[in-house]
Each structure stands twice: as C-alpha cells, then as structure tokens.
Amino acid sequence: MAKEGGLGENSRWSLGGMTALVTGGSKGIGEAVVEELAMLGAKVHTCARDETQLQERLREWQAKGFQVTTSVCDVSSRDQRVKLMETVSSLYQGKLNILVNNVGTSIFKPTTEYTAEDFSFVMATNLESAFHLSQLAHPLLKASGSGSIVLISSAAGVVHVNVGSIYGATKGAMNQLARNLACEWASDNIRTNSVCPWYITTPLSNDFFDEEFKKEAVRTTPMGRVGEANEVSPLVAFLCLPSASYITGQTICVDGGATVNGFSFKTMP
C-alpha cells in the first residue's frame, strides 16, 4: 500500500499541510512552480538573488492569498545555502515535504573557449547547489515522513542542444543524481525526480536566445511552438502530490516532442 504521509486518501490531489522550498522563485519556471504549489495548498518558501524582484512577487502572492515566504540567497554560495536551509528548518519546525532545485544558469561559448572560472561558476550554480541543498534538506525531508525532491534539469541533459557543453554536462549529471537519490533515499520515504524542459519562454531564455534560435527551436519541435513556464509547473506539482507516491527516479521531458523527434519530412513521399 502506498504511504500517504498521514495526509489521508481524500488528499491525494492536494498539497494542503505540506511545506516546500523552491529555489529561484522570483521569475520564470521557478515563479510558476511557487504559484502551482501554493494553489494546491502548500506553504512555500522561495529564494532569489534580487530582493526587489522577490518583494514584488511576494506582494502579488499575498494578494492571491498564497502562503509564501521569501529570503535573499545566491545558491552558488555554499555558506548561503547553509543559511537558507537553516531558515527553512526554523520556519517549518525541522520538517520539509518538497524541495524544488530550480536555479540554473549557462555561459554560451565553444568548448575550447571556456575558462576555469566559467566551469566553476556553472557547475556551482547548477549541479553543486542541487547536490548540496538535497544533502542539507535530507533530515528535514525524512522528518516529514513524505518527501519529494524535483530537480529542474533540461532537455540539454538528455540530448545534444548547442547551448554550451558545461550546461549540458550539469543537466545530465542532475538527471543521474535524481536516479541515485531515488534509490538511496527510498527507505526514508523520499522520492526524487528530474524534469527536463525544452525551450520555455522565460526571462532567461529571452536574454540568451535570439529570434533565429527560437525559429530553429520551433522548427524542430513536433508541436510547432515553444513552451510556457505554466506548462512545466503542473508536472512539478504532480510529482510532489500524494497521488504520485510510486513515481521516483524518473527523468521526464516537457518539450513538445522535441527530444523524441528524429528526422521529420515535411511531406510523406
């Protein structure tokens, strides 16, 4: 029988009574995830580097009646990650149901042009932060009796996408981390899954990708369009629900079919 963590059969499609930490929640996919979890009843804490943006989002969330708290944190910093988890532990009395490792960045260069500093920065922001925050969250997730970790990875961790080899390497490693933690922490009733978006319209993608890149992304996507942040967040929320209690160690793409698209003829012969 599936463990419900004391939530009861009638709460299979609710996050009421649960607590969550979402990194990078002030914009893009992170913002959409915060709202999705809060709409389902979770108490959510989120962090970002920009305090002004955080306060703007917080006012919006409070106006909607969401139970959200915020703090400033640069998750590429080990000391700040430790402080963040101390804050979360204090807020939620040493228990946490949901951890969404969402923060990510990239530097787009040919592989031969990357510096040691480039490598360290992308690795620390994407992979090291997800690994360390999962470590720090483990006792809180275990104490909750029903824990779920979701790593926001990328289609670039599943197939080649020319957005930087370091970025792709970090995302591939995150997918494997999800598999490892799923097996290692299953006995603690902690599930871990990886969500891999393709081209999603966010402030980050708008900053990095020009219209030509977007056209190419659309051309290679069977659904013929790019995605939106609120098309990723429902999957993240589902993986945290009691109804997903037997799903762990999975890598799931949200990509309009892009990662399964081989070579598609415009017209059949």
From Swiss-Prot:
The active site is at residue 167. GO terms for biological process: defense response to insect; regulation of defense response. Pfam families: adh_short_C2 (PF13561). GO terms for cellular component: peroxisome; plasma membrane. Substrate binds at residue 154. It comes from the Eukaryota. GO terms for molecular function: alcohol dehydrogenase (NAD+) activity. Keywords: NADP, Oxidoreductase. Induction: No basal expression in untreated young leaves, but rapidly and strongly up-regulated upon abscisic acid treatment. Strongly up-regulated (10'000-fold higher expression at day 33) in the quinolinate synthase mutant old5. PROSITE patterns: ADH_SHORT. NADP(+) binds at residues 21-45. Its EC number is 1.1.1.-. InterPro entries: NAD(P)-bd_dom_sf (IPR036291), Sc_DH/Rdtase_CS (IPR020904), SDR_fam (IPR002347), TR (IPR045000). Belongs to the short-chain dehydrogenases/reductases (SDR) family. SDR65C subfamily. Unspecific reductase providing both diastereomeric alcohols from the prochiral ketones. Active on cyclic monoterpenes and small flexible lipophilic carbonyls. No activity with tropinone, nitrogen-containing tropinone analogs, tropine or pseudotropine as substrate. This is Senescence-associated protein 13. The gene is SAG13.
